[in-house]
From Swiss-Prot:
Cofactor(s) annotated in UniProt: Zn(2+)
Binding site for Zn(2+) 2: E146, D180, H215, E260
Record's keyword annotation contains DNA damage: yes
NCBIfam families found in the cross-reference section: nfo (TIGR00587), PRK01060.1-1 (NF002196)
Reactions catalysed, as given in the entry: Endonucleolytic cleavage to 5'-phosphooligonucleotide end-products
Function text: Endonuclease IV plays a role in DNA repair. It cleaves phosphodiester bonds at apurinic or apyrimidinic (AP) sites, generating a 3'-hydroxyl group and a 5'-terminal sugar phosphate.
Organism of derivation: Bacillus anthracis
Protein known as: Probable endonuclease 4
InterPro entries on file: AP_endonuc_2, AP_endonuc_F2_Zn_BS, Xyl_isomerase-like_sf, Xyl_isomerase-like_TIM-brl
A Pfam family recorded for this sequence: AP_endonuc_2
SUPFAM superfamilies noted in UniProt: Xylose isomerase-like
Broad class of enzyme this protein falls into: hydrolase
Amino acid sequence: MLKIGSHVSMSGKKMLLAASEEAVSYGATTFMIYTGAPQNTRRKPIEELNIEAGRKHMEQNGIEEIIVHAPYIINVGNTTKPETFQLGVDFLRMEIERTSALGVAKQIVLHPGAHVGAGADAGIQQIIKGLNEVLTPDQTVNIALETMAGKGTECGRSFEEIAKIIDGVKYNEKLSVCFDTCHTHDAGYDIVNNFDGVLNEFDKIVGIDRLQVLHINDSKNVRGAGKDRHENIGFGHIGYKALHHIVHHPQLTHVPKILETPYVGEDKKDKKPPYKLEIEMLKNGTFDEGLLEKIKAQ
């Protein structure tokens, strides 16, 4: 079974149940959530996440595994502000606890961090320090380090940087990787013409067994732009053919594929989610040039 879904919202009183219902309405077989707003530290207590009802709904609809994304505000790469580093460590610990409580997520996707001017090596050492403070040998979920585009002072812009972080961490069996197609393309890897070669390079440097999550996004920018701006499937510089190949890649059948493509529409207050139609299009193997108009008409 193709494990494909998108980012969905966990909100209101229904929380996990709402997320599962939204995913099912898109024809998804997996999904990704934030356990609270990605840009702040406000979190509902675990008891209010409506876990039991959400899990029951998932079970009824054949969804076995979901992904959690850590909030953007975590930056364990910060070497200049101890309070930012400490917030990242404390918050990541809390996210591990919350993700474990869900019982259906094995991976927490984490943007490794930004060195904020101290240089990549210093940032990587700080990320290693943070992960060593957080990870324990008995935790049940992995931290999936996301491949980054190289925007600003982001660490994790190359497979070598990801490998360096993993190698420095004591309990690194608790680390995996989230391969983001837009980020990897924007960082300079040729996933359009040579995805198999890129995957082979990843295997040599990091190890393909670590690749546990895929973020499937097209890109608004040319390869190597270092920008990180997602585009709808088939409407960017990566293109439908390459993304379809990645989604159906025989070496990655077990890996959940998560869409984070932009909502569609001119009116900011009335943008439509693209996921139902994008998932259908990735399943059926044919690019639909009229897709964006169909999304708007939903």
